């Protein structure tokens, strides 16, 4: 296979356009929101089920496309998605958002911090795209998070509550990582310092304090006191949002976020010295343990002893890792990260990108075979793949090549 030049901005821009074309215009449900389930060829295979993670990520996708391509159809699609979040997912009595819906009615009313992070990301990205009516919704979401989810003691967010705001004892890194991402987007949209300060607090507490309890890496699962729970989901290691084992993709995703923090704070001359070495450590360890030297690509998970415990190849792991490699290359100047960027893109282009219909396949076996023809079930939306491309394009426009 002939590979394009992944250091050419136009290549990434075209890749975003073809990925958006997989979803548009078929993703738009005229009766409200977006369809969430797609076969490889784009056929919608469940028209009535909705998931908060997809509902929010489709807003992100369309708002980002509106910024990049200056096309009013994307702004209208983003507004269409925001209306569904406000009118259908959101419970005006509690302020919470339904996790899943069936036929426009709440199915699972659990309040997940992970979902709230994407609500804030959706509102923030919409504001960046010029949808200024979403600005007060950012404030509303901050207040909801402060009231119910944030724990000042550990300086992290609680994970999940029922519809009446009774919280479980589970604590997790995944929600806090995506909350850090959302806070960075909120800061970009508003220039309100509280968002940047909170993003730094979350990053510090997860990648330094909590990582110090888990071999210097970010473990996924904790008890109510933020002690490491080494056994959570050990019997269900492929759980969609709470898998067992160290997640290489989350180490590299944190590395990406640390580099964004470094750039924002560095512009003020206030970037903590630990950001770059911590990001490098997380990325380097992830690739050391999880890169598949035989079949290529980054494995999904590795155990505390360093052995691979889940050798599947997930789309988002590769996407987040190539974005992290680009930002590490930009910040450090170390040529090894540019090499990783090229290597991960080459693998992804050959095996995960669907050059016939567009977008990325979701998951492959270790030897790069598909499991099924469900390219994009609820939660995917190719937010990770396009988000990574946007991040790299931004680095290129700052001068990275």
Predicted segments with their positions:
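Glycan-recognition and catalytic cores of secretory/periplasmic carbohydrate-active enzymes
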Residues: 1-401
């Amino acid at each position: 296979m002939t590979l394009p030049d992944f250091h050419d901005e136009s290549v990434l821009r075209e890749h975003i356009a073809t990925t958006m074309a997989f979803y548009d215009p078929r993703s738009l449900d005229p009766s409200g929101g977006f369809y969430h389930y797609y076969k490889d060829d784009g056929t919608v295979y469940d028209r009535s089920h909705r998931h908060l993670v997809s509902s929010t990520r489709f807003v992100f996708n369309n708002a980002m496309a509106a910024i990049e391509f200056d096309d009013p159809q994307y702004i209208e699609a983003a507004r269409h998605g925001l209306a569904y979040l406000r009118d259908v997912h959101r419970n005006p009595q509690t302020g919470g958002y339904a996790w899943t819906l069936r036929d426009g009615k709440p199915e699972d009313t659990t309040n997940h911090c992970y979902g709230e992070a994407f609500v804030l990301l959706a509102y923030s990205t919409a504001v960046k795209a010029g949808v200024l009516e979403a600005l007060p919704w950012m404030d509303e979401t901050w207040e909801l998070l402060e009231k119910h989810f944030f724990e000042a003691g550990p300086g992290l967010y609680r994970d999940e509550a029922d519809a009446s705001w009774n919280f479980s004892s589970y604590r997790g890194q995944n929600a806090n990582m995506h909350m850090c991402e959302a806070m960075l987007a909120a800061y970009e949209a508003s220039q309100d310092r509280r968002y940047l300060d909170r993003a730094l607090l979350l990053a510090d507490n997860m990648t330094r304090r909590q990582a110090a309890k888990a071999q210097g890496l970010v473990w996924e699962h904790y008890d109510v006191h933020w002690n490491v729970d080494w056994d959570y989901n050990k019997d269900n290691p492929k759980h969609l949002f709470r898998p067992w084992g160290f997640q290489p993709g989350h180490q590299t995703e944190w590395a990406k976020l640390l580099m964004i923090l470094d750039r924002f704070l560095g512009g003020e001359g206030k970037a903590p010295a630990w950001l770059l070495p911590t990001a490098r450590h997380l990325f380097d360890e992830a690739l050391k343990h999880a890169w598949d030297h035989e079949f290529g690509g980054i494995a999904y998970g590795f155990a505390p002893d360093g052995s691979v415990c889940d050798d599947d190849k997930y789309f988002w792991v590769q996407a987040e890792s190539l974005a992290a490699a680009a930002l590490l290359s930009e910040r450090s100047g170390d040529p090894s990260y540019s090499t990783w960027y090229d290597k991960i893109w080459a693998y992804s282009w050959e095996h995960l990108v669907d050059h016939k219909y567009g977008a990325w396949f979701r998951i492959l076996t270790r030897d790069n075979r598909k499991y099924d023809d469900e390219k994009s079930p609820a939660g995917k939306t190719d937010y990770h793949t396009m988000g990574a491309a946007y991040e790299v394009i931004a680095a290129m426009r700052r001068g990275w090549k």
